[in-house]
From Swiss-Prot:
Protein name as catalogued: Valine--tRNA ligase
PROSITE patterns for this protein: AA_TRNA_LIGASE_I (PS00178)
A GO cellular-component term linked to this record: cytosol
Sequence motif: 'KMSKS' region, positions: 520-524
Binding residue positions for ATP: K523
Domain of life: Bacteria
Entry's localization field: Cytoplasm
GO MF entry, a single one: ATP binding
Native organism taxonomy: Bacteria, Bacillati, Bacillota, Bacilli, Bacillales
InterPro entries membership: aa-tRNA-synth_I_CS (IPR001412), aa-tRNA-synth_Ia (IPR002300), Anticodon_Ia_Val (IPR033705), M/V/L/I-tRNA-synth_anticd-bd (IPR013155), Rossmann-like_a/b/a_fold (IPR014729), tRNA-bd_arm (IPR010978), tRNAsynth_Ia_anticodon-bd (IPR009080), Val-tRNA_synth_C_sf (IPR037118)
Entry's free-text remark on domains: ValRS has two distinct active sites: one for aminoacylation and one for editing. The misactivated threonine is translocated from the active site to the editing site. The C-terminal coiled-coil domain is crucial for aminoacylation activity.
Keywords linked to the UniProt accession: Aminoacyl-tRNA synthetase, ATP-binding, Coiled coil, Cytoplasm, Ligase, Nucleotide-binding, Protein biosynthesis
Function, in words: Catalyzes the attachment of valine to tRNA(Val). As ValRS can inadvertently accommodate and process structurally similar amino acids such as threonine, to avoid such errors, it has a 'posttransfer' editing activity that hydrolyzes mischarged Thr-tRNA(Val) in a tRNA-dependent manner.
Short motif ('HIGH' region): ranges: 44-54
Name of the gene encoding the protein in the UniProt record: valS
Amino acid sequence: MEMKPKYDPREVEAGRYEEWVKNGYFKPSEDKSKETYTIVIPPPNVTGKLHLGHAWDTTLQDIITRMKRMQGYDTLYLPGMDHAGIATQAKVEAKLNEQGITRYDLGREKFLEQAWDWKEEYASFIRAQWAKLGLGLDYSRERFTLDEGLSKAVKKVFVDLYNKGIIYRGERIINWDPKARTALSDIEVIHEDVQGAFYHFKYPYADVEGFIEIATTRPETMLGDTAIVVNPNDERYKDVIGKTVILPIVGRELPILADEYVDIDFGSGAMKVTPAHDPNDFEIGQRHQLENIIVMDENGKMNNKAGKYEGMDRFDCRKQLVEDLKEQDLVIKIEDHVHSVGHSERSGAVVEPYLSTQWFVRMEDLAKRSLDNQKTDDRIDFYPQRFEHTFNQWMENIRDWTISRQLWWGHQIPAWYHKETGEIYVGEEAPTDIENWQQDEDVLDTWFSSALWPFSTLGWPDLESEDFKRYYPTNALVTGYDIIFFWVARMIFQGLEFTDRRPFNDVLLHGLVRAEDGRKMSKSLGNGVDPMDVIDEYGADSLRYFLATGSSPGHDLRYSTEKVESVWNFINKIWNGARFSLMNIGEDFKVEDIDLSGNLSLADKWILTRLNETIATVTDLSDKYEFGEVGRALYNFIWDDFCDWYIEMSKIPMNGNDEEQKQVTRSVLSYTLDNIMRMLHPFMPFVTEKIWQSLPHEGETIVKASWPEVRESLIFEESKQTMQQLVEIIKSVRQSRVEVNTPLSKEIPILIQAKDKEIETTLSQNKDYLIKFCNPSTLNISTDVEIPEKAMTSVVIAGKVVLPLEGLIDMDKEISRLEKELAKLQSELDRVDKKLSNENFVSKAPEKVINEEKRKKQDYQEKYDGVKARIEQLKA
């Protein structure tokens, strides 16, 4: 297969993915004797297109799956998408609002039709993006969290947990999103520090002079106050416990009660109790059997319990209420106060603690089982391990999970209420006399169905499902550390509860993709990067390799166009190295022609040794998910060892007349390049397939080729030391040429004073490499080389490298040239020093600019020191 002179990712990638899918390369093996390896994709939300975080996530999964397939596993990489209840509903509602329509105008059924249309549109976008990324997914098994099979699983789980008493319906304080008009779980609330105020009010005693001072950050909730509490041990209030105060504005009498919850040392030591609008107040209210007065509606507006403030937005009510209290001289003081305020993760609205009847999951026993499991052989391994502590901590402090949502898009709760008796029926099927029942209108939290993803996608609850029996538990979960609580923890406790096994063996957690300056990528900052744009510019292989190797497990990744471009340059280097190799291997060279038992040269032995070392390193690091280190190992071997050294060294036999040696070199080139392609394939699937198809190969695709294995018979330890000596000598000669301003094209005499006879013999046997890379007019290698008076000498491991200077350069002219260069460098150093010592510049210039100046100074100083040393050497 022809390779064009220049690497063009568009040409390389065009049609390749479609060919892989069409030929069924990503389907599991039909050989059931193979060990299985399963990854289920973390389902992206159908709210929109994939971002760089998704690209990173799925690239890592695809790398692991491709590698395991090559290692002989029966692999399944299962695709799917999440309905993303609140997020998708918000998108669809926003689209309708543009047309002046609300979901209530349409009604539930018509609205859901719109939501399904949205899902289909964005699902097709997502599949197209998966294809561009080259993900080896088995589309015949694609799942969606609202499809029939998963809906069946959701109903069974809900009903089973309800029957066990783990799911219950109750009235509690929940997090209410007044914009989305739905309940939220604790982890869907983002806490942000907000500049607010502490309002100190007078609550007058009902039957005596005086008042109790009460402080609050939410004055609007006082309209729902039902008591004042003080600590029974607080001497200040001993005489007033049991008395009453008048609730300002409202005029309602509130009892003064004793409760040890109150902190004597905080504020006045007295606090108001609003059971319907604060979780702690609710608990106090339960203990003292207080009335629950809800003063807001679901939109965050004051209701008819708020008196004259009815219909006002909660924050407008706050302002007006404070003004009214001022008029009645009931405001003691208002203090500025920065405090943590909960915001909806999805809508951004300030979350309201709100008394509501919802469905909950009782978490204590589920959490305990998850924690206990981590002490058994069935434990889940976290990468990095520190996240296991994060998981354990959360499980130890978990609260009951609010699972009902006041939405239409999602799994409708399988609970019905009898129209006459109010009886609750919970079941996988609707009641037979459905006309007498009304189904609960709420839907389940999106994460409820996502928590079942590893087993529901494989056919559960059908325990006889072939996929469930063969591919569960899954092997690895790859996801961001930001959803340990949302998703990872919930999959673990649901997996243990319903399958009695961990849902996955390993959890590999990565960080967030950040902008180059370290800030989070966001629409508001305008610093987001579309992965498809990157692919259009540099190709999928460049993006994949950057994402996979640019960070270590658990750490964030800074996106850098420059680094993606450097990967593109790396692929170009690979492409050019492959083209050279293929031209020398020849079209007639076949797999069976590869013979590594012949007369291997030093370069052959060395590159085969380094190849085997790299195979061992890459395999070991990949098993630990250390793909950043894998990237470095591959880069160093391919760029430095193979392309820069071996390919150049292979030109010696290939340009010679020894046909037997040429055939050996062809074998080594072919074998090494083939193994490089196999190691690179999981990272760069497109370009490796293209090059591999051009190489002598067996099989129809590199996708199904075997993973490289270490061959002990092709490890020649002694070659490494000899090659190290040669490379050091070559680098020394080239550096000396630069220092005396003599180009490589000019032949010069070179002397090598070997440290001992053994080294002399070794270097003499391999002098062809020194001649090729150093271009000497004469080359003298000996233990007793006489070093001329005027010479440039470098000490190396093998001895000394000597360049006689007599007749090579005009010493006086060279010293004069170097002194002028030194003066220029001194001038540049002075300029940079002046800039960096200028306080005005340092205080105003961006950090990037200052760092660039510091880098320049370091470069100039190194050059200055080098030139000065050369002058001193020449003068000596």
